[in-house]
């Protein structure tokens, strides 16, 4: 455990038409297709890590999405309830929404791994995550023809 085959770290990226003119590139959404065996192992590791985070109460109360019984829909309902309570009590609400483009891609991998380690994820699981995140490649597939990596 700890090693990830290079073939598992290669994504085949293809474009799926969303809407509008097919001649307009912005009307396509990229989809990354990866090895099914890797996806299965990813899910096993995700469940193990999430279980560790929940058991050790390492997730903050505001964490929604990717957490059992804490969907982003529930988050929206909780926020709306809080805002309604504040407004009903004569208060004001100021909201700033931020969408950080490619946020995960901008996180330094060494910092992410240090944070994961500080949460008690160690040994082979941490090695696997580190290996999984390094030397990733992708090819673009158009009409069944692959680009070079």
Regions found by a protein language model. Give the residues of each.
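Conserved pre-catalytic core of RNA-dependent polymerases
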Residues: 1-149
